[in-house]
Amino acid sequence: MRAGNRFVEDLSQMKPNVLFIIDSFEQGGSERQAMQLLTQLHASGQCRVHLACLQNRGSLRAEADQLGIGEIHEYALNSFYDLNFAKQLRRLVRFIKENEIDVVHTHCFYTNIFGMTGAFLAGVRARVTSKGETDGFRSPMQKRVERTSFRLSHRVIANCLVVQNQLIREGVSPAKIIQHYNGLNLERLKVRSGLRREEALAAFGLPSGRRYMSIVANLRNPVKDHPMFLRAAARVRAAIPDVGFAIAGEGELMEGLRELAGQLGIEEDVFFLGRCDNVADLLFASDIGVLSSKAEGFANAILEYMAAGLPVVATDVGGAREAIAEGETGYTVASGNDELMAARIIELLNEPKRARAMGERGKLIAAEKFSCDRHLKNTLELYDELLSKPKSAPTGIGHEWRLNE
C-alpha cells in the first residue's frame, strides 16, 4: 500500500488522492464548474483524481467517462434522516480509507453535508467545501445542517464576495473562508473559424433578419425566474418588433413557460432551444445576454456572455455586480423588475455601436479576471497549504506534502 512506503518514497513525487463529490451530471452551473476543475486537475498531473456523485444522471456523465479516471461511485440518497444515509455514509468512509484519499472536495449543498460527514469520520486531512449560492430558497433547517458541514471542513470556498460575506454573517469563521471566483473555459466559447451568423442561427432553428437576446439557464429550478425574462421580452417586443428571444436550457418548467409566452402574445418570438451543447455558437449569433435569476452565487452565464463579447443585462443578485461593470459592460436591475430590464435591453438595441463596445470591454475583463487557469492555480495552492500541515494521526506521526511545481 502507498501508506506503508511513504517514508521511503521521494515525497516530492507523491501525488495526493483527491476525491470530488458532485450532486449529479446535469448541466448545472456548479456541476459544470466541478467537472471543468476536475478535468484540469487530472490534466495537470499534480493529483490523482477520483469522482463520486449522489445521482448518476445527466449529460455531463459522458464527459466524465472520457477522462479515464476509473470507476465513478454513486451514493444515492433520499434523505439525511433515514437508514440509507447511514449505509451510504459507511460506503463512502470505506472508499476513502481504501483509496487513501487525502483531499475531499465537495461542490454543493447536499454533497457538502454528505461528503464532509464522511471525510470527517474517515479522518481526511484536507476537507474542502464550496458555497456558490446566496439566500433565497434554503429552509432554516437546511441552513443549520449546512453550517455543520462547514464546521467539519478545513476551508469553505466562496465563489464571490457576496457569498463570502453571507457565510460570515451566518457564523462561519472568516479564517476558514477563502474566496475563489469561478473559472471560465475560454476554449469552450470559441467558435470555429469562418462561421457566419446566419449559419449559426440556422443551426438553432432561429430565423435570420432578427436581433436576439438570449438566456442560458436551466429550466429545472424556478429560482432562474424565466417568467421575468418573458415579461421583459414582451415589453421589448412591443417597442422593437424585429427582436427574437432564445432560451437555452432543459427542464420540466418548459411547458409552463411556453404557455406564459402564449399568454403574453410572444409565442412566435420566443425560441426554446432545450439542452445547448454549443453555447459558443448561440452567443456568437446573439446581441445581448440576459439573466433573470432571483438568487445566484456567481453566475457562470454572466461570465460566458462577457467572454462571448455580449453586453449583459442581469438581475442584481449574488455576485452580478462583481462581474458586471455597471454601464461599461452591462447593467444590473432589481430582481423582478421586468420593466427596467426591458428598458435597459431597449437602450442597448437602440445604440448598437455602444452595445458592441460594452461587449468588447466585458470580453477583456472575462479573459483577464476569470480564467480557468487562475481557478486551477488557486485550487492547487489551497490543497498544498492544507496538505503541508502535519496530520494529527492516531500514530502521532506527521509529514509534509508538496504538490509538484
Set out the residue ranges of the language-model regions.
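N-terminal strand-loop element at the rim of the active site
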Residues: F7-D10, K15-P16, F20-G28, R32-K87, ...
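A conserved mid-protein helix/loop that constitutes part of the nucleotide-sugar donor-binding site
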Residues: E31-T39, R211, I215-A238, F245, ...
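Short hydrophobic beta-strand element within catalytic cores of glycosyltransferases
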Residues: C53, P311-A314, I324
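A short helix/loop element that forms part of the nucleotide-sugar donor recognition site in Leloir-type
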Residues: R91, K190-L206
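Short His-centered aromatic/hydrophobic patch
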Residues: T106-N112, K131
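A conserved, positively charged/aromatic
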Residues: A126-A158, N165, E170-V172
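Conserved acidic donor-binding segment of nucleotide-sugar-dependent glycosyltransferases
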Residues: E326-G327, Y331-D338, E347-K353
